[in-house]
Amino acid sequence: MQVGIDIIEISRIKRAYERYNRLFLKRILTESEIEWCLNKPRPFESVAVRFACKEAFAKAMGTGISGELSWQSIEILNDKEGKPTLFLKQPFNGLKSEQVKLSLSHTHEYAVAVVIIEPDK
């Protein structure tokens, strides 16, 4: 089992967006994630928690975001009930999305993500 955790101040995400606008979002999110976040009442919290989740996933993998693992290759989408799920848009180390468990949370100030990667059965 591998575990990764990340926390970020939502104000950092907001400042980056104010400086770079949609270019910032396009760098760290997929189009589906951008659409979902921008339709939320507090979009910066949604963006920040996805940023934290991608960072936590990279930490759990022990690779960081670079090379094969890019911001765009990881996608966090919510199902009809609102449960977030991590999808890999391209194969990475033989990992299946079903092996990845997420716990995401945020306040008005911080977003936090915990990622657990279970061994393949």
UniProtKB/Swiss-Prot annotation:
Name the family the entry cites.
Belongs to the P-Pant transferase superfamily. AcpS family.
Which Gene3D superfamilies does the record cross-reference, listed alphabetically? 4'-phosphopantetheinyl transferase domain
Which Gene Ontology cellular component annotation is one that this UniProt entry carries?
Answer: cytoplasm
E.C. code = 2.7.8.7
The record's function comment reads: Transfers the 4'-phosphopantetheine moiety from coenzyme A to a Ser of acyl-carrier-protein.
Q: Please list the cofactors this protein needs.
A: Mg(2+)
Q: In terms of one coarse class, where is the protein primarily found?
A: cytoplasm
Keyword annotations: Cytoplasm, Fatty acid biosynthesis, Fatty acid metabolism, Lipid biosynthesis, Lipid metabolism, Magnesium, Metal-binding, Transferase
Q: Which reaction does it catalyse?
A: apo-[ACP] + CoA = holo-[ACP] + adenosine 3',5'-bisphosphate + H(+)
Question: Per the UniProt entry, what are the Gene Ontology biological process annotations, in alphabetical order?
Answer: fatty acid biosynthetic process
Where, in this chain's numbering, is Mg(2+) bound? Answer: D6, E55
Its subcellular locations are: Cytoplasm
Q: Which InterPro entries match?
A: 4-PPantetheinyl_Trfase_dom (IPR008278), 4-PPantetheinyl_Trfase_dom_sf (IPR037143), ACPS (IPR002582), Ppantetheine-prot_Trfase_dom (IPR004568)
Which superkingdom does the taxonomy of this entry point to? Answer: Bacteria
What are the GO MF terms of this UniProt record?
Answer: holo-[acyl-carrier-protein] synthase activity; magnesium ion binding
Question: What taxonomic ancestry is recorded?
Answer: Bacteria, Pseudomonadati, Chlorobiota, Chlorobiia, Chlorobiales
Gene name in the database record: acpS
The protein, known as: Holo-[acyl-carrier-protein] synthase
Q: What class of enzyme is it?
A: transferase
